[in-house]
Amino acid sequence: MTKITLLKGNFKSKLALSIAPTIKAGFPSPAEDYLHDSLDFNHDLIRNPEATFYGRVSGDSMIEAGICDGDIAVIDRSLMPIDGDIIVAYINGEFTIKYLDLSHKDDGYIELKPANSNYHPIRIDDSDNFRVWGVVAWTIKKWRG
């Protein structure tokens, strides 16, 4: 099971970085070879600081969703989870990150689905100590360095 270590962020600091207006995945345009805007992670990634936490991902059960070991998840506890969301769940004493599948709710259970075909869904019913701890709003990935 992919685990997540939860961390509280310091959202009072301001880090304004230059940002390009768009980054095209096709052919580059020489007319856009300049930066003219800025990005403040606390403003742009954090909608509700009091309800936002970071989590360091440990494991590979979400790799097909692009969430890998060592990535940082930005978790917003103020968001209402909906079917298909990537969530952080507390289940039987552990935190995990998975897709939320509510399609079996009328049958008395829900599933937490991995994004890795080597893992099976986790079936959750009333006998489990379970709660949705928060919704993953963003992920931060380290590619190099």
Regions found by a protein language model. Give the residues of each.
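Structural motif
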Residues: 70-71, 85
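Short, positionally conserved secondary-structure boundary motifs
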Residues: 1-63, 94-95, 109, 118, ...
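Hydrophobic beta-strand signal
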Residues: 74-75, 88
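Short, compositionally biased
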Residues: 83-108
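Flexible, small-/acidic-enriched active-site or ligand-binding loops
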Residues: 117-123
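Charged, well-structured alpha/beta interaction segments
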Residues: 64, 73-74
